[in-house]
Amino acid sequence: MIDSYCYHPIHNRWQGIRPVSSPGILPTVVEQSGRGERAFDIYSRLLRERIIFLGTGVDDQVADALVAQMLFLEAEDPEKDIQIYINSPGGSVTAGLAIYDTMQQVAPDVVTICYGLAASMGAFLLCGGTKGKRLALPNARIMIHQPLGGAQGQAVDIEIQAKEILFLKETLNGLLAEHTGQPLNKIAEDTDRDHFLSPAKAVEYGLIDRVVDSLTGGGIVKEG
């Protein structure tokens, strides 16, 4: 007998954008030293400054990379902030929760900075940064909504997946309520459909703490 059940991963991703697993363009920088020239890809160079980029959709591969970078930076210096720049349409809920849990567990404060778009799981991770250190650039856009997914096959299999997606929806809504200070019923209402916010509105909502109007050298955020 052939099993006709087909599992569809549960996502928290804006469908207006197709996520990619890796950057299409990878600039390099060259440094001079007493030993000569040394070339780095730009992301490796910025990692030395404790800056991590989430500039793609969220999947297991991306989650593994971000978790590994955070653990490495924690081992390097458990007291110095980690900065995560986010421009992401979202993606896998379970992969996103793996990143989120690591953000909560590492010793350093995690500064989250939205540039471009933080949608779905991207917005959830933005909101999950250390309180007081969740930021957005002036023309960024932020969007929250409920998870999406599906299943096909026998009725019992579909029922199992329906229960799982409802569980994840309640989990995400509860965490958003905790981080924003909004009532759970308002989170549930606002995430029922795509809900876009400007940075200023996101501050009012509690998704972020302030809008950045300038950045100093080294990626350190200056009060605006």
Curated annotation (Swiss-Prot):
It is found in: Cytoplasm. The gene is clpP1. It holds the Pfam family CLP_protease. It catalyses: Hydrolysis of proteins to small peptides in the presence of ATP and magnesium. alpha-casein is the usual test substrate. In the absence of ATP, only oligopeptides shorter than five residues are hydrolyzed (such as succinyl-Leu-Tyr-|-NHMec, and Leu-Tyr-Leu-|-Tyr-Trp, in which cleavage of the -Tyr-|-Leu- and -Tyr-|-Trp bonds also occurs). The keyword Cell membrane does not apply. One of its GO terms (molecular function) is ATPase binding. The keyword tRNA processing does not apply. Its EC number is 3.4.21.92. Its main location: cytoplasm. GO terms for biological process: protein quality control for misfolded or incompletely synthesized proteins. Belongs to the peptidase S14 family. It comes from Prochlorococcus marinus (strain MIT 9313). PROSITE patterns: CLP_PROTEASE_HIS (PS00382). It comes from the Bacteria. GO terms for cellular component: cytoplasm; endopeptidase Clp complex. This is ATP-dependent Clp protease proteolytic subunit 1. Fourteen ClpP subunits assemble into 2 heptameric rings which stack back to back to give a disk-like structure with a central cavity, resembling the structure of eukaryotic proteasomes. Cleaves peptides in various proteins in a process that requires ATP hydrolysis. Has a chymotrypsin-like activity. Plays a major role in the degradation of misfolded proteins. The active site is at S120, H145. Keywords: Cytoplasm, Hydrolase, Protease, Serine protease.
